Amino acid sequence: MDEILNTINSPRDLKKLSLPEMTQLANEIRQLLVKSVAKCGGHLASNLGVVELSLALHTVFDSPEDKIIWDVGHQAYVHKILTGRREQMSTLRQYGGISGFPKVEESEYDAFNTGHSSTSISAALGMALARDLQGQSNSVVAVIGDGALTAGMAFEALNHAGQEDSDLIVVLNDNEMSISKNVGAMSAYLNRLRTDPSYSRTKEEIESVLNRIPGIGPNLARAAGKFKDTVKYLMVPGIIFEELGFTYIGPVNGHDLAELKAVLSNIKKMKGPILLHTITQKGKGYEPAFQKPDIFHGVGPFDVDTGTQLKKSLKTYTEIFGDFMLNQAQRDNKLVAITAAMTSGTGLSEFSRNFPERFFDVGICEQHAVTLAAGMASSGLRPVVAVYSTFLQRAYDQIVHDVALQKLPVIFAIDRAGLVGEDGPTHHGAFDFSYLRHIPNLIIMAPADENELVDMLHSAFSMEGPVAIRYPRGVGEGVRIKSERQLLEPGQSRLIAEGQDLAIIAVGRGVSIARDVVDLLAGKGVNPLLVDARFVKPLDRRVIAGAAQKYHRLLTIEDNSLAGGFGSAIGEMLVEEGIDAELLHIALPDEFVEHGRVELLFEQLNMNPDSILESIAGKWPELFSAGSRWELLKFGQN
């Protein structure tokens, strides 16, 4: 079944294959992709769309000497298969297995770590300039999608690359047909001419190129003489790239191996910055993904025969947010929703269909999204910016300068906060408390369950100034959402359990963990107070200060980085209040956390209930009886 694929252990093995063998290899790779993602979850549709492109790149170029940088990196599975990681695909995105994104620590063939969008051209240009300064001659290739090309950073890099005139190849993987549909015989003929080294084509030479097109060429050339600028813009679909200093080539059929190899071979010999525009189809070769590429962009485990995903019984926080937005929009005609190319991921698909005039998908432009919201808020609207925690980092200055400084009522719905699991360190939302907490005028909340999320969203519309609500990926706690909404006052915490031995102050996902810790402590004869803080800023200073003064032992639990997070805020507050109390902070460590199931990651980080119990016993052994201490000691040694 995989008779060719099993012989491919490095890109060198591709160079001896015939075209029919490579076509068969493409089919075998697609079968492995479907099998692997069905088991492990991941990005399927985009990888099915770049099989031929990946094969052609690794056949023409000599990786790892030649550098190939995959923008975002979610489409690099084929690259991994071709570079010695075929046997590890069964561990894709699993703890201890291979990453779902390029990772320099994983392989010498991964030239640059990616995970966020639109960084590839900047990184590739940096490598090209470093190569030039060091007198080297290797090729540098950036592979970027049409969606990623919407980001300002990509255009900044294109602009700079055109000025530098260094040898750099940018492959535009257009899998949405959003830039050009001009694929056909005439385009193929032009591509052959454009990439033939005997034609050093310039804008001034376009007439000679037109003359070589069979049949219609001379007439077009005569028209070009009369309408030079018009013809230039009509005949060169990538004129924007030409004006930026790139030689534009394309569109090329991204599934035609022979064409791709021929064009790339010629491009490799050309000088200066080159942009190759390829047209690919997401989901190619697997019908469910081909028919619904958006569903199979990022997908959980599924049944290969039907494409049906394994369903979860509870609603996700994302779905609950989406439901709230639909209901709120019916009551408040000033509500508008903004997202940065994450309509489905942030739960706004139904909103976009029901309220298209009040929905704005700005593309991969988080900075613009935030300042767009600021402009709307300054003019009387109530914008909600729905964004992943890890991507909101990209708009930090806009949050500070354009929103918070002016106290504008923008609501940030921050999805995928804390650990997100299998997507790993580039996607964990580990830092939002830390990078938001010190911004003046900003209120920050984190729900412990589904009902609390709805209460916080409801309350945000009554608060003055900007509000950030961060919530985790995945399903909720199974709490019933009440029909009556509670209007929360800024800083208002919730007492969950009275106690007498120590105080536990938790927030967000930390509350669920804290509940389990309380149960474990009760089994050891320890009775703690448990408070759901709800707010990271402002803190409920009265409740927290009172607990510290009464118990003198304070345990904080959060799923944010320890540095600058919720626990740090409490420590700072106690110093300000002059309260002497012993603190134990449970939070994410000062390191980038690997990929894997969230529950397993918490266990590895000693943030699961059993590990926290051990930490409490180590910090305050006097809370436990002699027998309990001995049991905990033995447990910790096992």
UniProtKB/Swiss-Prot annotation:
Binding site for thiamine diphosphate: H74, G115, H116, S117, G147, A148, N175, Y286, E366
Name of the encoding gene: dxs
Catalyzed reaction equations: D-glyceraldehyde 3-phosphate + pyruvate + H(+) = 1-deoxy-D-xylulose 5-phosphate + CO2
Protein name: 1-deoxy-D-xylulose-5-phosphate synthase
One GO CC term on file: cytosol
Disulfide bonds: none
Cofactor: Mg(2+); thiamine diphosphate
UniProt-recorded Gene Ontology molecular function terms: 1-deoxy-D-xylulose-5-phosphate synthase activity; magnesium ion binding; thiamine pyrophosphate binding
Pfam families for this protein: DXP_synthase_N, Transket_pyr, Transketolase_C
InterPro entries per the UniProt record, alphabetical: Dxylulose-5-P_synthase (IPR005477), THDP-binding (IPR029061), Transketo_C/PFOR_II (IPR009014), Transketolase-like_Pyr-bd (IPR005475), Transketolase_BS (IPR020826), Transketolase_C (IPR033248), Transketolase_CS (IPR049557)
Pathway the protein acts in: Metabolic intermediate biosynthesis; 1-deoxy-D-xylulose 5-phosphate biosynthesis; 1-deoxy-D-xylulose 5-phosphate from D-glyceraldehyde 3-phosphate and pyruvate: step 1/1
Residues binding Mg(2+), per UniProt: D146, N175
Function: Catalyzes the acyloin condensation reaction between C atoms 2 and 3 of pyruvate and glyceraldehyde 3-phosphate to yield 1-deoxy-D-xylulose-5-phosphate (DXP).
EC number: 2.2.1.7
Known partners and oligomeric status: Homodimer.
Organism: Syntrophomonas wolfei subsp. wolfei (strain DSM 2245B / Goettingen)
Top EC class, one word: transferase
UniProt-listed PROSITE patterns: TRANSKETOLASE_1, TRANSKETOLASE_2
Family: Belongs to the transketolase family. DXPS subfamily.
Cofactor remark: Binds 1 Mg(2+) ion per subunit.
Gene3D superfamilies in the cross-refs: 3.40.50.920, 3.40.50.970
Gene Ontology BP annotations: 1-deoxy-D-xylulose 5-phosphate biosynthetic process; isopentenyl diphosphate biosynthetic process, methylerythritol 4-phosphate pathway; terpenoid biosynthetic process; thiamine biosynthetic process
Keywords for the protein's UniProt record, in alphabetical order: Isoprene biosynthesis, Magnesium, Metal-binding, Thiamine biosynthesis, Thiamine pyrophosphate, Transferase
